[in-house]
């Protein structure tokens, strides 16, 4: 625990006073607030989502809970609705892959809009935001697999946006990733890839405002964040594992540093990923797509590219920084009496370093991201799309006519490419 501040405001957990629920409830009354949870059906079989539900039930003044659900059948969607049936606020279960949703969104292709993002968190977040920001001033996003969810999580994520005159538009979480079972350090993607990568790039490129910005976040891959409607409506949403870095890049594009905050949520644990057997699996795939997201941000914000001659230097720097971090994490674990698999960590850094050269080559061949357009762009030519999408996401009978009845009028506002 410290009190250091950096480029962005850091809200520490000083643990000296209990959270004040009255303060949060008053803020929720003053500013309509929605919590968004992207979710797979498998999460309903695990205890984490039940824990999250029990905590959120206490937020009586919450405007709405949006569940962006990928499900295989109407029966599964109804099961999800029943799961949240007793909440003291409205719950909208957006069936993201419903037939009506697919029919609605695919109809925009003739206007040059590809809204059928690959299935995953990015597409779910984009849909959930579209539904949430219709009438909410603040939106907070939490993953469905958080095993350590406490009342402090929504309180600390939301208060910076709800307090009068705070001026904050975007909040991102940071935390200590420890296994609940073994107490070992987790978060290899952040500790052993993103951290060493940003440091190595800074050493290679020198002065870099964008890299300084990313390094100001203590946990840049945190999937928990909150923002105002005015910001959310302007964000393009990445559709791969570069979602978190890509969103940070979008926030950097739209918001001054003084309007960004990060919040300490303390101990945090959720579902873990394996390293993967190939670069297209597990953490290896995730880190490859994160690398592309960082490189794209450097291009967009600074016009900076990594030349073929610099690749070898970046590989060497990454490996050295990664090995230095392992030494530091080993000592940190030893003093805190935590188990630490140093050999496993060394192997992970070696594997991550092998992703850099092919990852750079793939990025240079195709530097454009798979991004869903911002809602401000869509609403400029399809002003009723949010309502149509929400209606389609509620279709439970397989009869798409009622769910997409408004779509032709909405689409007609967009000029055809033909």
Regions found by a protein language model. Give the residues of each.
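Short, acidic, metal-binding catalytic loop of nucleotide-sugar glycosyltransferases
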Residues: 51-63, 82-83
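A recurrent flexible, glycine/aromatic-enriched loop bordering the glycosyltransferase active site
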Residues: 181-191, 202-224
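Catalytic donor-sugar/metal-binding loop of nucleotide-sugar-dependent glycosyltransferases
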Residues: 239, 248-268, 277
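Active-site-proximal specificity loops/subdomain of glycosyltransferases
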Residues: 15, 76-136
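Terminal low-complexity segments of carbohydrate-biosynthetic enzymes
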Residues: 1-13, 88, 271, 275-418
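N-proximal low-complexity "stem/linker" segments adjacent to membrane-targeting elements
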Residues: 1-57
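Conserved donor-nucleotide/metal-binding helix-loop-beta segment in metal-dependent transferases, i.e.
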Residues: 147-179
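Short beta-strand-to-loop acidic/aromatic patch adjacent to the donor-nucleotide binding site
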Residues: 135-147
